[in-house]
Amino acid sequence: MLAMSTDKLFARQDFFPLWPDEPPGGGGPTGALRISANGSWSNIVSPGIQRFVPENPNGKAVLIAAGGGYRWIGMGREGWPVARWLNSKGYTAYVLSYRLPGEHWQDGNRVAFQDAQRAIRLVRSMENNVHLLGFSAGGHMLGLAAARPDYASYAPQDAIDQIIPKADSVGLIYPVITLEPPYTHTNTHLSLVGNHPSPAEEANWSVQNYVTRAYPPLFLAQAEDDHTSDPENSVIMHDTCRKAGVSVQMIRISQGGHGFGLGKAGTPAAIWDEAYAVWLAARN
């Protein structure tokens, strides 16, 4: 496990702290950022966004949130590789490092959602077209943020918070969508509502319960053999969006499990990225 500051990882112009001072509510971990051997982050003292700029920008930006059950952030498998792949397609990519609920923040289970809203606002302050792409728990977080742009999860900090955190589209890859029974075994469920939540708490953190006709166009991809986030999560979100009149496309992958990122070349899990690229190119 490595420990280092974000200043040593990125040039200052490439990393933007989310908050002007300490994050809402205060508290949080101390010490340096922790990076595991596979590139997963934890001990998130200073949440922010890392920008990847392509050689020939197409005028569209994608905010990426990697997963990790709200216990860590899978930068090495999902964040950075996906950002560089999007760069190859002309998209400016922003990779979000968000606060983790179990790291002693005073605002508890709200902190990642606060960071998601703030990140969308921050990217909107720099870009005209903002698309969201979330994986696993990161998909839960961005999917929920896309559904609740008018919800004030924190008190305004500065002028950036006057921007409505709306997205132009949402891509959710093997996402956690619902925390309601029988889908209660995930780390996302444990991190956000614990072992013995009320039905109201589980419903409050379930993305599908906030979908309206105003939800952005949605792309979903998940493997049928995903034993971490039940594939029914994507089915529930797909069907909810269809009923609400939201444009939605879902890719069902025959094999791949969970957490495959871009997918290994030559495997069924490697099909989603090009399908997403075609879909995203059609979003105006």
Residue ranges and their predicted role:
Residues A214, F219-Q222, D226:
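Short beta-strand/loop motif that positions the catalytic acidic residue
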Residues Q114-H185, E202:
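Primarily recognizes the serine-hydrolase "nucleophile elbow" in alpha/beta-hydrolase
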Residues L179, D225-S229:
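Acidic catalytic loop of the alpha/beta-hydrolase fold
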Residues L33-A37, P175-Y210, P216:
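Mobile cap/lid helix-loop segments that gate and shape the active-site cleft of serine hydrolases
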Residues G59-G68:
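Short beta-strand element of the alpha/beta-hydrolase
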Residues L9-P57:
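N-terminal cap/lid segment of alpha/beta-hydrolase-fold proteins
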